[in-house]
Amino acid sequence: MPYVNIRVAGKLSREQKEEICRGVTEVIATVAQKPKETILIFIDEVDHENIGSAGKLLR
């Protein structure tokens, strides 16, 4: 059973999450030859203030 964990900075709409799930599921099913119903996708939304780059917080 494939597990895919996606972390994004900021918030996504429900529609964006659904589109990501559809697209990622299609790619994993095709490339890994796994049944779509076995693919789990986790989307973690992270506040910009909790992400650092080059020694500084994004916000």
Q: What is the role of each PLM region?
A:
Residues 2-59:
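A domain-level signal for the structural core that forms small-molecule/cofactor-binding pockets
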